[in-house]
Amino acid sequence: DVYKRQRCASICGGWVALKLATNTLKKSGQIKFDPITRHVAAISCGIVNGEQKLDLNYQEDSAAETDANFVMDDKGELIEIQCSAEKKPFSKEEFEIMFSMASEGIKKIVEIQKSALDE
């Protein structure tokens, strides 16, 4: 649903906003070191009509047999996973494909975050 997409976008954009704020605080001398040690990003994925898809839009999410959200850091470590069988159970293999897709998607999002921050 729209909430899930907004949630993933909020995590990605919120992390950038927090990083910009800590950069400003560090430059002004209000903090001595940057407490943020890793990038954090989130992405949705799911199984729609038997096919694994990344970053589901509203129509895909509404039709999904399985729906998942992954939150990871730039080292590929997991922060949160939410995965539900919406219409039918899914296999471990299907989950692993979604996990792999989400990992690759998050790598791309982290690159966009770095670009936005001129890192």
Label the predicted regions.
Residues 8-9, 18-23, 30-119:
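A structural signal for small-residue-enriched, beta-sheet-centric alpha/beta enzyme cores
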Residues 2-3:
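Short, small-residue-biased leader/transition segments that mark boundaries at the very start
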